[in-house]
Amino acid sequence: MKKFLVCLLAVLTVGLFAQELPWQQNFDNALRLSKESGKPVFAFFTGSDWCGWCIRLDREILSKQEMKKYLCDNFILFKADFPQKNPPPENIMMKNHELMQKYGVRGFPTIVITDASGKALGMTGYMRGGPDAMMKVLDKYVKKASPK
């Protein structure tokens, strides 16, 4: 019985750490959720299957448990992915390209933080220092977005 409980706990723990982030694929939906929650939008522009820096950002920062918790607690997450394999439907790709133009995204990875109206509060990308460095930068935007 003791072994069973230890195994069960191990399986549940692995499942918790493997949890995916709740990315929105529709920016309008992300803005609606932002209005409802009061959280700013974390818009991640990426080439998930071909961009080396995007893959590195995901592996070194976004996939870390403390970063996942921070992002979920403080942001509505939107991902504009431009993969080479298995691209999203044409209408989503068109919208993502429009958003790139709107926010002046010129390369990947780019993170744009917006308020609930879609106004850009700031922009960043890959940075050294892991989750702590990223959270320090993002904290400034969370404070900007919070009502006074």
Task: Give short role names for the model-derived ranges.
Residues C51-I55, I111:
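The canonical Cys-X-X-Cys-His
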Residues W23-V41, L71:
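A short beta-strand-turn-helix
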Residues F4-V14:
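Sec-dependent N-terminal signal peptides
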Residues L21-Q24, M67-M94:
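Thiol-based oxidoreductase modules, predominantly thioredoxin-like and allied folds used
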Residues C54-Y70:
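Typically the conserved alpha-helix immediately C-terminal to a functionally engaged Cys/Sec
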Residues S37-C51:
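Short active-site neighborhood of thiol/selenol oxidoreductases, capturing the structured segment around
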Residues E98-P147:
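Non-catalytic, surface beta->alpha helical segment in thiol-disulfide oxidoreductase systems
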Residues V14-E20:
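Sec/Tat signal peptide C-region and signal peptidase I cleavage site
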